Amino acid sequence: MHYEKFPDGTVKCIEDKIPFELPEGWEWTRLQAICEPITDGTHKTPTYSDEGFIFLSSKNVTSGHIDWDNIMYIPESLHNELYARLAPQKNDILLAKNGTTGVAAIVDRDCIFDIYVSLALLRIIGYIISPEYLLSTIASSTIQNYFNSSLKGIGVPNLHLEHIRTTLIPVAPINEQYRIATKLEQLLSFADKIESDKIFLLTTIDQTKAKILDLAIRGKLVPQDPNDEPASILLERIRAEKEELIRQGRIKRDKKESVIFKGEDNSYYLKIGNLVESLNDWQIDDIPETWGICCLGEICDYGNCINTDTKDISENAWILDLEDIEKDTGRVIQRLTKKERNSASSKHLFHKGQVLYSKLRPYLNKVVITDDDGYCTSEILPLEFSNIIFPDYARYYIMSPTFLRYANHCSYGVKMPRLGTADGKKAVFTVPPINEQKRIADKINQLFSLLDSIVKNMD
């Protein structure tokens, strides 16, 4: 059984407070029994200055480390007052009382500084406890769970000094403490390396996916088939059909029609009205001979959306919002109805098989092909492509680094950048023969599936 003796001589059984049994030679003790009087920093909001003495708060304490870069300063007069009350020193432990509650770090440098009320200061008595051992103990799930259960307050929960002082700490023999601290350091270093390698691999996979898309839209991902009907013939057919519709008066000619042509220098140019601009930035001079080049607005109804008032939408209709689409993948991560979403704004109607493109914050790269009819936020454009464009190829093209770079460059607005309709319509689009588009999409799906399986097996 475990008992605790109090200063007045009384003894109390604390068996129900003991978290677990310890090995022989270990003992449970209160944190206040192994530290000098535990206190916290100043309770007064300080007056900061551009220079002076370092002033730390819980914002400067992360798990196991003190952030000495993003610090505040206080004037000498205030420092003298605070330092006379509490003078932190090297090897003290700073424990966050609020904010990132329960997070602690060892003071790892010999310098003069002061602390705010959000930090408690633990200074070990003598050499009975290794600072590294105590830090690892505080970081354990047992102590953290105790801290979390002791939080007080509603807005910003606080860990009161009394609960810190009475925290039960398992104390190992001093030599074993050092062995534990050394082993933990080795394991944590190994874990950090694994995490670093994982981040590197994830970054490499993202870069590989981007490179695959880049090769795909330049005709370098799958071999060409000379028997495929050239895309240029298909594009000419579309243009001829459009001219016929204009002649019949069924549609009007765009006053600022975008036309891509090849100059005498064998480079591509974009003509809009009387303006001509080079397309060298698109790097399309070496696409296969069977491919064609056009503006996005020539092969889809970019910007021609059907707006629907919310009162005309069924309660059970699918309402797609930007937050429902995972960035960079084109996956729909949640599906809500109008009743579940409770949205009052008008929506864009979309149909199964259309490519949906988020014009808002294009850097998030949210592009999806729908598997059902529904309605979406007005920041998403449903794109209906002509029958010479395979939807999966169109989606991958719009997700490619080349298109993404263009969309980000043309976006307007600082906080909420979006791609304008005119810029979207004149975006360059490389068109392979329809059969090659399918082969490209199949190859991308195959390669992406392989890369995704690698990521999945990392978890």
Could you tell me what each predicted segment is?
Residues M1-E15, I205, K209-E289:
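Intrinsic disorder at enzyme termini
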Residues M1-E24, D69, N80, P88, ...:
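Flexible, glycine/threonine-enriched loop-and-boundary segments that flank and lead into catalytic domains
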Residues K12-D40, S189, D197, L201, ...:
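Non-catalytic DNA-recognition/assembly elements of restriction-modification systems
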Residues C13-D16, E27-I66, E81-Y83, T101, ...:
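Low-complexity, Lys/Gly-biased intrinsically disordered segments
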Residues F20-T29, A120-P131, L161-A181, L188, ...:
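Proline-centric
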Residues S57-S58, E76-A139, V156, I164, ...:
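A short beta-sheet element
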Residues N145-Y146, T166-K252, Y406, K426-D459:
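Amphipathic alpha-helical coiled-coil/heptad-repeat segments
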